[in-house]
From Swiss-Prot:
Similarity field: Belongs to the UPF0434 family.
UniProt organism field: Saccharophagus degradans (strain 2-40 / ATCC 43961 / DSM 17024)
UniProt-recorded name of the protein: UPF0434 protein Sde_1297
Signal peptide extent: none
Disulfide linkage: none
Short name of any one Pfam family annotated for the protein: Trm112p
InterPro entries assigned: Trm112-like (IPR005651)
Cellular component annotations (GO), alphabetically ordered: cytosol
Length: 63
């Protein structure tokens, strides 16, 4: 589980938009950029090159 205080401070490094915590997938999702940043060993990896591109269906599911 990601600390809620930490989550409130983090934003997408590309768009500066807020992130959505997807606990089952262990990702931080940015709908604005269409990217999902992995969480590895409890640490968010906030690098654009490490992010996964969301499908259109995934983007819609987070709205």
């Amino acid at each position: 589980m990601l600390d809620q205080k930490l989550l409130s401070l983090l934003v997408c490094p590309v768009t500066k938009a807020p992130l959505i915590y997807d606990e089952p997938k262990q990702e931080l999702v940015c709908v604005a950029s269409g990217l999902a940043y992995p969480i590895r060993d409890g640490i968010p990896v906030m690098l654009e090159g490490e992010a996964r591109v969301l499908s259109q269906e995934e983007k819609e599911s987070y709205k």
